[in-house]
């Protein structure tokens, strides 16, 4: 893929938590977010999975030894970037379905 953003962010946990506990929070927070996909355990996001889409794939791993969480995300910066976000926001403002015009975007390059 000749485009895309793959991000890895690190955070220190204030207390020890399990993958399942944190996953419940992710699922609860993103359950109504049409374009956010929380991946299965041990599946890192890849830009090829979001190419040409408005989706953002996220996942995380916890290092219990250091009490750190590593959060990963992937998005197509040409669709989910400013243009796709503008269409998504316009849809919400105008009372249209959030995904209107964003499910079958053109693929170039």
Regions found by a protein language model. Name each.
Residues 1-71:
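C-terminal substrate-binding/catalytic lobe of Rossmann-fold NAD(P)-dependent oxidoreductases
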Residues 57, 62-109:
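NAD(P)-dependent Rossmann-like dehydrogenase/reductase catalytic/cofactor-binding core
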């Amino acid at each position: 893929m000749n485009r895309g953003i793959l991000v890895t962010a690190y955070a220190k946990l204030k207390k020890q938590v399990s993958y399942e506990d944190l996953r419940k929070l992710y699922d609860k927070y993103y359950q109504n977010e049409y374009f956010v996909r929380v991946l299965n355990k041990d599946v890192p996001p890849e830009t090829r999975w979001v190419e040409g889409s408005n989706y953002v794939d996220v996942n995380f791993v916890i290092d219990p030894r250091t009490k750190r969480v590593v959060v990963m995300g992937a998005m197509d910066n040409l669709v989910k970037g400013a243009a796709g976000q503008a269409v998504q926001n316009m849809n919400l403002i105008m009372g249209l379905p959030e995904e209107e015009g964003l499910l079958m975007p053109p693929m170039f390059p």
